[in-house]
Amino acid sequence: MEKEKVLEIFEKLEVINKGHFLLSSGKHSDTYLQCAKIFQYPNYSEIFSRELAEKFKGYRIDVVIGPAIGGIILAYEVARQIGVRALFAEREDNVMKLRRGFEISKGERVLVVEDVVTTGGSVKEVIELVRSLGGEVIGVGTIVDRSDGKIDFGVPFESIVKLQIKTYEKEECPLCKEGIPLVKPGSRKL
């Protein structure tokens, strides 16, 4: 999908928000991407998931997993496109875990998906979880890569769109210095 088409859909669905945001990574930004707006529409969920699944065509995948909350619907839809199981990892006591009877068997080939990647923190936690259970991570996929090319997961990393959006450490944030109120829209520590 062309970047212009993605941005057109994002604009239509009001995915891109402007302000002063605390991201789940702990960084600050003037832009927040609310991909949940995509997933409220099954047709858009299917379009983006099919696009992401297509990027991993030719890989043998047994399971698709995503971190809660942003990766739940994406993992399910990508898995549906591929025809495999879908799981999600949840944070419990600040650690990513499989719950609800979910399991990964030793040797299963796993694709990790997330709606937006900035620092890759949640994805790295899910990768560690999968490996600790004996699974083999074969790739990482995301709708939006806003990492500015600064992440290496050690496996193929694919995105539907790359966006260059500035992020700041709290101490260096110009929005804080201007006294603009900070909003925390993400799902970390729900």
Swiss-Prot record:
GO biological process: 'de novo' UMP biosynthetic process; pyrimidine nucleobase biosynthetic process
Position of the signal peptide: none
EC number: 2.4.2.10
Catalytic activity annotation: orotidine 5'-phosphate + diphosphate = orotate + 5-phospho-alpha-D-ribose 1-diphosphate
Gene Ontology MF terms in the entry: magnesium ion binding; orotate phosphoribosyltransferase activity
Co-factor requirement: Mg(2+)
Pathway: Pyrimidine metabolism; UMP biosynthesis via de novo pathway; UMP from orotate: step 1/2
Pfam families linked to this entry: Pribosyltran
Binding positions (5-phospho-alpha-D-ribose 1-diphosphate): 114-122
Binding, orotate: 118, 146
Keyword entries, A-Z: Glycosyltransferase, Magnesium, Pyrimidine biosynthesis, Transferase
Gene3D superfamilies listed in its UniProt record: 3.40.50.2020
UniProt subunit comment: Homodimer.
Protein family according to the UniProt entry: Belongs to the purine/pyrimidine phosphoribosyltransferase family. PyrE subfamily.
PANTHER family: OROTATE PHOSPHORIBOSYLTRANSFERASE, URIDINE 5'-MONOPHOSPHATE SYNTHASE
Role of this protein: Catalyzes the transfer of a ribosyl phosphate group from 5-phosphoribose 1-diphosphate to orotate, leading to the formation of orotidine monophosphate (OMP).
Protein name: Orotate phosphoribosyltransferase
